[in-house]
């Protein structure tokens, strides 16, 4: 699928969902400063660690919190590393998403939409991994659009750009969808950041 078609498909869904929290008055912020990949990893690992350490003292803790409180906790988690992806203030929890869809990054609006149903699960791993996965897609797109502002090598950026231009949708071939470069990279990023952050929890 060509990138334009992919963007059009995303835009068709843009107004379909209702927010679980009021939309921030602030628009998505895009940085034009250098976004180092190692710094992104370090900040994300620290964000995972700090999320779990904070929950030891938080009132109420995540398991006892309302859906709205959980969304706020996870927004703060995302805020701790999102600027390193190239964007900030772009996380939204939305209702009415297809139950099979956990989240999505919109390359046109730069929004990250997360399925609000994930907030009902007391276990945070799935929703945190989804936030990190979609944040990695944000970084991939930022790298393609601003190669001079990232530490990613040009060959990798070329591969990502080509993949976005010929993106494989999961409904067409799920195995190929999972194995394509941008999805394999986002899955690896989310898994590594979560595991390393969890290992650092005091």
Language model segments and positions:
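Auxiliary, metal-adjacent structural segments of Zn-dependent hydrolase domains
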Residues: 2, 7-110
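Acidic-residue sensor for enzyme active/binding pockets
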Residues: 14, 30, 134, 140, ...
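Short coil/turn segments at secondary-structure junctions
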Residues: 61, 65, 118, 122, ...
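Hydrophobic (often cysteine-bearing) scaffold residues that line and stabilize catalytic clefts
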Residues: 66-74, 124, 128, 178, ...
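Metalloprotease/metallohydrolase-associated module, dominated by Zn2+-dependent proteases
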Residues: 87-89, 148-202
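Active-site scaffold of zinc-dependent metalloenzymes
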Residues: 94-125, 138-141
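A conserved beta-strand element that flanks and buttresses the S-adenosyl-L-methionine
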Residues: 131
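Catalytic Zn2+-binding segment of zinc metalloproteases
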Residues: 134-152
